[in-house]
Each structure stands twice: as C-alpha cells, then as structure tokens.
Amino acid sequence: MCSAAGASKLSDPNSINFRGGDNTAEWDDTYRSLLGCPVTNLTRDQFRQAARKRGSGWEMYTYGAHKTLFWLFAVEYATLNSQKSFNAQKDANGFSQGGLGLGPTQMTDWVNFNNSNPLIPCGYTNEFGNSSGEKAYVVKNSSDGTHATLMANRYRGIENPFGHIWKYTDGANIQVTTGDAGLSILWTTDDPSNFSDTSYTGYDKKGNICRTLGYAKKMLLGEDGDIVATEIGGSSSTYWCDYYYTHTSNNRMQVVRVGGDASSGSAAGLAVGGTNYVPSDAYRNFGSRLCFFPKYKSTEITTTTE
C-alpha cells in the first residue's frame, strides 16, 4: 500500500506526502530515504481504514485476493515453487517456465541498516507493465557504495508479490486455543462488511490448520483452495516450497500474513504463511496492498472502535 491517498497519481514520488515505512522524516534525501516507499508499521485496522478512504469498493489486501494470485501463478507456471529462477522465454510449447526468481529476499543486516523499513520505492518495476519480470535494485550505503542487491520482481503487473515486506491480509482470521485439546482454526470471508479484528461472525469455518512451524507439506485446500498449512515436512524446493509460521501459546485471534520479507531468503514465496501475529501488531516490515472490488462498490461499511 502506498503511503498516502492519491497514490494512483504518484507524479512526485519524492514528495513528503508519499513518505512510507515508519515515516522517519530525518532520512529524507539520504541513502535511507523512505520517500516513495510503501507504508508500514500500521495495525491491520489502520490499513483497512486507510484503504477505505479512497471510497466504496476499496479495501486493503485480502486473503482471497492473495489466494487467487497464488493459483493464477501456479497454473501459469505449472509449479508451486514461486522462487524458481525467472525465465522470460516460453518453453517449446509456448508456456511459461521457471518462476519469479528469489525476489527481494536477500537483505543483510536489515535491522541495523534502517530498522527493517522498506527498501524499494513503489513502481520500481513499472517498465514491465502488466507482464512479469525481475530487476536488480541496489541498496546503497552511507558512502554511496553497495550494501545489498535485491531482485525486485513483478507478476502480471503486481510488484514484489512476495518478499520485501510482509503483507497483512484481511478476510482471514485464525482462532487459536491452547492446551492439549487446543486447535488453530481458519475462518474466512470475502465480504468486506464482515471484516473484523474481534469477531468470527459472517466468516466461514474452513478447518483446522497446522500448529507447528516449518516448511509446508500439505495445505488445507478444500473446495476453495485454501493455502494455509495443515502439515509441515517440506523444504524450500519440495512440496509447497515455502515456510509456515504459527503461534499456539495464547488463546486469541491471529491474522494471516503472506509473502515473507527482505530477509526471508528461501523461506519466502507466494505460499508462505504467517499466522503468528495478532491484528493489533504493527511493525516496520509489515505492510499491505490496495485493492478494488467492484462487486462491493455499493456496499455500505460501518465500523466501531472497541
């Protein structure tokens, strides 16, 4: 999600109106500038409300939207491993091959560099338009040397679909209970009027998910193709090829984050799932996306603060 309303007309990405990350102003015009970068360090509801300021039908990134994106990629490239090397050439039958590359996942010493704030400005891969591709982004240090080189990627017009910063999703909640009989249950909805950080009302109960972290071996799937792990035991190159994070020590509602971040390495990808944080968490490496859903354009959405 870009850092201010009107991002669709990003005529001057270096304007202070488009300062992203945690909004550190003293970094403007330095090697750590956050101007033009995606906004982070907000709670899920803050992302939700920011998206809705654009008007009816606008929402933050949803679990349903990401799930659709994953399956479009999997069908087009005939692989579950989104981090396979990018290959711009079609195979002998005219089909896409390879994957989307490592993505921006190889950042070193990120915390000390800029407190794990975003690194790549929005629109860096716009030259690919609605196509797919990857492009090296050089992270400069204080002496204008190279601190790290990240591979920004794009899938069908969507920039950095994984890596760089974690993406908060709406429309999916995890109900966690503790103890020997404890469960972690996935609840989802596509209806923005039901989106909530405190209730499962209006959500569909999808099933029990994995309570141990590791590389995903099996996903919940079902008739809706849910991509939250039910079993671990894979690796970065087998089964679902991405990591699964969870937390089971507290009775609480948890969220679904996707994609991994700039330091995730081979654990990142389109199928990585982070179900270990709560809706009120806000971190410099947590962001989201802006989505428009024409079906819900006329939906009247009201929220209450509790």
Segments predicted by a language model, with ranges:
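Residue-level detector of alpha-helical recognition elements and their boundaries
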Residues: N81-K84, T177-G179, L290, T305
